[in-house]
Regions:
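A generic structural signal for secondary-structure junctions
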Residues: 29-30, 142, 263-266
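TOPRIM fold recognition
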Residues: 8-16, 20, 155, 181-184, ...
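Phosphate-handling DNA/RNA-contact segment within nucleic-acid enzymes
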Residues: 111-218, 231-233
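N-terminal single-stranded DNA-binding subdomain of primase/primase-helicase replication proteins
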Residues: 1-27, 120-127
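Generic secondary-structure boundary/loop-capping signal
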Residues: 48, 78, 142, 156-159, ...
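TOPRIM metal-binding catalytic domain and adjacent DNA-binding surface shared by DnaG-type primases
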Residues: 28-131, 139, 178, 242, ...
Length: 292
């Protein structure tokens, strides 16, 4: 519960429901709500009045991190698979770090996995083997999963994402690990974010939208290296105009994303550090980078 102006508001971090205190009381006890309304208007404590904010402060409730789920039906942690398993081979070929592998799941049947996790989800899901990326919020609550198709999977949909709650908030990967008091890196893909410290994955190219949802003073936007992609070029131009720190990839980089750069042997952390720009410098570097 938190205070805004003269009103108190309630927000459930489990189901995502939010309302003011009056509506909450009305749902719980209609008769008590009538008394509540009378008292507020009698004292002048109405959202439509010039009532002075109360002198006392209501402390914000403290929410501690919960323990993450350790067991999932129809899935196993990748780190527990035998060394020759094709999912392990896939991760090894993509140069996934051991810290990355520890956070990922494997399911031989993504449909069964999703059906058990969120019954009656209503999505059409293929019953194929997938590498599963769990999404958590800042309290370690599971808020979604994304299944990445593997070598022997149906490639109709490379990624299939499923929410585990009814919230309409944007799914952002890595919010359980990010420290907003330090520089926050924002990339497109969840896998790419795992190669960098204090980094989140937007799940798409809408990095500006994601940046606005993260309450951090220092942020850097790291778009994929696609100088011929008109959409990416436009989004990067917008980010520069909004004075964000933006990575402008140097000409020597031919790969599209961070994972591909790692596989090619590049020191991605140093490249990002040396090629982060803002303002006029970013604009000049951007003009030299784009190809459309």
């Amino acid at each position: 519960m938190f205070q805004k102006g003269t009103n108190l508001f309630f927000n459930c971090h489990n189901c995502g429901v939010g309302t003011n205190l009056g509506n909450l009381i009305k749902q719980v006890d209609p008769s008590l709500h009538k008394e509540y309304v009378l008292e507020r208007y009698k004292s002048g404590e109405s959202g439509f009045s010039n009532f002075k904010s109360p002198a006392f402060d209501i402390p914000a409730p403290r929410f501690d991190k919960v323990a993450k789920e350790k067991h999932f039906e129809h899935a196993e942690w990748v780190s527990k698979l035998p060394s020759g398993h094709f999912c392990i081979v896939y991760c090894t070929n993509r140069r996934f770090l051991s810290t990355m592998i520890d956070t990922l799941l494997f399911t031989p049947n993504y449909k069964k996995f999703c059906d058990a996790l969120v019954p009656n989800h209503g999505k059409e899901i293929t019953a194929d083997a997938r590498l599963v990326i769990p999404f958590y919020d800042k309290y370690n609550t599971l808020i979604g999963v994304s299944g990445r198709a593997l070598e022997n999977s149906d490639y109709k949909l490379r990624y299939v994402t499923l929410r585990t709650n009814e919230s309409q908030d944007k799914l952002i990967y890595g919010m359980d690990k990010v420290n907003t008091n330090e520089l926050v890196k924002i990339v497109e893909g969840p896998f790419d974010s795992m190669f960098l410290s204090n980094c989140v994955g937007s799940g798409d190219s809408a990095l500006i939208q994601t940046a606005k949802l993260i309450d951090a003073e220092n942020k850097v936007l790291i778009f994929d290296n696609e100088p011929r992609n008109k959409e990416i070029v436009k989004l990067m131009d917008d980010a520069i105009k909004l004075n964000y720190n933006v990575v402008i990839w140097p000409d020597m980089i031919e790969q599209k994303d961070i994972n591909e750069m790692v596989m090619a042997g590049h020191n991605v952390k140093k490249i990002i550090k040396d090629n982060t720009f803002t303002g006029l410098t970013a604009k000049m570097k951007f003009i030299g980078w784009k190809r459309c």
